[in-house]
């Protein structure tokens, strides 16, 4: 079967499955999720063997340490994915919830009820955990999903998707509810872009290149997620010990994720005291700094930052540093170069903290905390399918409610419109 025919076949199958899935009871969906979690742990050796093939090929291709970390599956991570599915079971099912109801003077009762989006196309890079997370969230919310992961993770994704679909169907969910695009040929993605007859939404999750391509080329509606050129601004009235801890965590805890900080802005009044301490800590942990001219006057051993550095999502142990003359200059820089993801200020000044919250245009804005908390689980929302950086439909971590839409339900007693 040709690539186009195969993808259309899968999309048609998903559309058919979504109609059945939308009406399936919560307890059946929860039973399926629990069974998938159990099966993942049982099959961990098989999963790790498949992942080892991807890891070896990744090393041969010269993938960075950070990207290899995203690709790797081990026993602990597989158990973590299974636990994530078990947590989904505990969460309330939003499907069928009537979020408001009112009565009109003519006696009509009108309500708004949550319903699944339908068929979701998930396009993502070499992160096999997304295969499990996305499938779990879609099944819980009654959505069928077509998964297209990065070629570097193809063997891992194949085994994970097979386990998920086989177990889900055995537990009573419709065939075709979870499918993986098996080919790594990019032609398959182009086909997905145009399947408005079968797909209700595309969710790209990955770097700027992937997301921009989907936005530019897709005819299917897109929810934009996660390019994270995130900033930390150290204000003139910052607690510098706190700032050091936060900047270090935001950059180094997992540099290859979208909520990691990529740029640091430091107020001129504290730069001489703060930057040498930061440089010492980062040098000890093999983090490269790239600075503006004023930064390099204090830290002459670091690389010069060029214009491109202010807008880059490194996803690596690299950070751009700029000294700013004022709070207003920091806000201007962030709103110019940021990607509307996660931005943080470190300050003890109440007025500036609240101005930062109001003036920064981003999905998550922090005062005295690391950007690394932008995550559905960390926000208490449960698992997430991605972090939306757009303003329509959903913004920020996209959990269960964000994978639903609403429809109006109207109860009458024979009313007709005059």
UniProtKB/Swiss-Prot annotation:
UniProt pathway annotation = Amino-acid biosynthesis; L-proline biosynthesis; L-glutamate 5-semialdehyde from L-glutamate: step 2/2
A Pfam family annotated for this UniProt entry: Aldedh
Quickly give the catalysed reaction.
Answer: L-glutamate 5-semialdehyde + phosphate + NADP(+) = L-glutamyl 5-phosphate + NADPH + H(+)
| UniProt-annotated location(s) | Cytoplasm
- Principal localisation: cytoplasm
To which protein family does this belong? Answer: Belongs to the gamma-glutamyl phosphate reductase family.
Describe its function.
Catalyzes the NADPH-dependent reduction of L-glutamate 5-phosphate into L-glutamate 5-semialdehyde and phosphate. The product spontaneously undergoes cyclization to form 1-pyrroline-5-carboxylate.
Name assigned to this protein: Gamma-glutamyl phosphate reductase
Q: Which organism is it from?
A: Halothermothrix orenii (strain H 168 / OCM 544 / DSM 9562)
What gene does this protein come from? proA
């Amino acid at each position: 079967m040709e690539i186009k025919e195969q993808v259309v076949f899968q999309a048609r199958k998903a559309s058919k499955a979504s109609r059945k899935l939308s009406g399936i009871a919560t307890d059946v969906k929860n039973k399926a999720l629990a069974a998938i979690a159990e099966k993942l742990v049982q099959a961990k050796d098989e999963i790790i063997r498949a992942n080892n093939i991807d890891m070896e090929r990744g090393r041969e291709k010269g993938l960075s340490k950070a990207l290899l970390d995203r690709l790797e599956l081990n026993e602990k991570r597989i158990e973590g994915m299974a636990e994530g599915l078990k947590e989904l079971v505990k969460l309330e099912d939003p499907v069928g919830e009537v979020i408001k109801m009112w009565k009109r003077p003519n006696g009509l009762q009108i309500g708004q009820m949550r319903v699944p989006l339908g068929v979701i196309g998930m396009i993502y890079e070499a992160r096999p955990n997304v295969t499990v997370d996305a499938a779990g969230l879609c099944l819980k919310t009654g959505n069928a999903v077509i998964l297209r992961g990065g070629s570097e993770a193809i063997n891992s994704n194949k085994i994970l998707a097979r386990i998920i679909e086989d177990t889900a169907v055995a537990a009573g969910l419709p065939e075709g509810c979870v499918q993986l695009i098996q080919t790594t040929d990019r032609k398959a993605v182009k086909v997905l872009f145009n399947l408005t007859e079968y797909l209700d939404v595309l969710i790209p999750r990955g770097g700027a290149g992937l997301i921009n391509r989907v936005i530019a080329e897709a005819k299917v509606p897109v929810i934009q997620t996660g390019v994270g050129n995130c900033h930390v601004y150290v204000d003139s009235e910052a607690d510098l010990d706190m700032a050091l801890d936060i900047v270090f965590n935001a950059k180094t805890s997992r540099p290859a994720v979208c909520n990691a900080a990529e740029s640091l802005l430091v107020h001129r009044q504290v730069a001489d005291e703060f930057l040498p301490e930061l440089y010492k800590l980062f040098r000890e942990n093999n983090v490269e700094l790239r600075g503006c001219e004023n930064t390099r006057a204090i830290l002459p051993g670091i690389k010069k930052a060029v214009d491109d550095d202010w807008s880059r999502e490194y996803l690596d142990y690299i950070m751009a540093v700029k000294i700013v003359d004022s709070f207003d200059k920091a806000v201007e820089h962030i709103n110019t170069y940021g990607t509307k993801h996660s931005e943080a200020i470190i300050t003890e000044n109440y007025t500036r903290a609240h101005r930062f919250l109001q003036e920064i245009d981003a999905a998550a804005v922090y005062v005295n905390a690391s950007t690394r908390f932008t995550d559905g689980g960390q926000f208490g929302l449960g698992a997430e399918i991605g972090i939306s950086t757009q303003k329509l439909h959903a913004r920020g971590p996209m959990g269960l409610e964000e994978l639903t839409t609403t429809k109006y339900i109207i109860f009458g007693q024979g009313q007709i419109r005059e």
